[in-house]
Amino acid sequence: ARFLRSKHARTSIRAAKGRPADASTCRRPRGSMAAMRSLSIHELELMANTIRQDIIKALVRAGSGHSAGPLGMADVFTALYFHVLHIDPKRPDLPERDRLVLSNAHICPVLYATLARRGFCSVEAFHATLRAFGSPFQGHSNTHFGIGIETCGGPLGQGISQAVGMALAARLDRARWRTYCLMGDGELNEGQCWEAFLCAAKEKVHA
């Protein structure tokens, strides 16, 4: 499992400080994966702001939902989905794709907005149907609509266990894809998180 304190997530920190990201630490060749032009720091910043605008539009239309967490994480999601993750919007179930687990799934508006801008789903549909009955854009993320979401969210503390399990599965399969987990600080009160951390350290899935 790769955590946000890793060298990959520091891409967004470099962007904030105006330093170029080291693409060699974030990109690796993957023959069957769709290639995407690397965005400049300025383009990443513009995309993050566009995602923030999408979040506000959808939340205002819905009349409810979390705003602070999604807005604050826009830079991180932009760095991951537009610079780090090896994914293909045309084939969201591709076996060799990287996985991202969103444990604190109540901040899912930023995930939806980012997936929409990355081409997994419609931006307009996200604006119009967030938290509506039958919409793929519910108050907590779920996997049932095939738009690039890896896990169902809701109970806090479960995401890191799921991510560690995915990372172990990749090792057993000798697969090259990587697992990333985003979680909130409040989740750390759950004992399940610490069991997952201990397992990750013992099995060295962080390396």
Residue ranges and their predicted role:
Residues 34-51:
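N-terminal hydrophobic or amphipathic helices/low-complexity stretches enriched
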Residues 48-64:
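N-terminal capping segment at the start of a domain
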Residues 55-58, 70-202:
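Cofactor-binding active-site loop characterized by glycine-rich and histidine/acidic residues
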